[in-house]
Amino acid sequence: MKNTDSVLRLITVLAFGFVLVGCETAPPTIQSGPDAELSFDGLHMVDNSQADVAWARPDFNLDGYTKIWPVGAGVEYRQAKNKGRTTMDRSKGGPYFIDDKARGQFEELVGEIFKEELQKVEKYELVDAPGPDVLMIRGGLLNVTSMVPPDPIGGRSAVFLSSIGDATLVLELRDSETGTILARSVDRRAAETIGGTFQRSNSVTNSSEVKRLIRYWATRLREGLDGFAQETASN
């Protein structure tokens, strides 16, 4: 494999693992041989990716790509029926139903933040169509869950939360012309308060936690792309 160290570092970052500077951790490796664990579409498991799950082609290589094309794969929400409209419903706790208005606001926020971060990528040109040197970055959110009840009943009750919800981000790298998948990562994270402490739930604090989570994912992606391109150019 060409530029193996750089490639595996990119997979690790794209899999949204933590960059552990100064810590002794095993490097990520793509399983190979007859005993390699394969995904449903033939990708090889990446060991030590420091993410929930990551796979890649055994010949994974991004040489030749100079542009990136982000493509949304949609958002799927957890099937929660509790709308928290009564005291009894509230006593059951979350997850809570996410209405169309909240879904629209969430999806708009995700799109804005990822677009903002990808526009900062220095080593790849951002495009909106396939091409011979275009890498498709396909991302989708699954099982989006909300632990936030609707507005307080009677406007009096206070709600304190340490986590307002969570979601799973699935990221795929594909060749834009053929659709061939090169790598996939799956990462589930919670939108939590700093330090996991309880704080009063309101629209301002809840929005802040959601933005922090989305920004975390988007920034890791941007840094991974720029870091890989820089290392490839120096080799």
Question: Predicted segments — roles?
Answer:
Residues 2-11:
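Bacterial N-terminal signal peptides that target proteins for export
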Residues 19-22:
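C-terminal motif of bacterial Sec signal peptides marking the signal peptidase cleavage site
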Residues 24-56, 166, 177-182, 191-235:
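C-terminal/domain-edge helix-coil "capping" segments
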Residues 63-136:
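N-terminal segment of the mature soluble domain
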Residues 97-109, 161-162, 204-215:
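Soluble non-cytosolic domains of exported or imported proteins
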Residues 107, 111-115, 141, 211-218, ...:
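Extracytoplasmic/secreted envelope proteins and their assembly/folding machinery
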Residues 116, 120-180, 192-201:
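Surface-exposed short loop/turn segments
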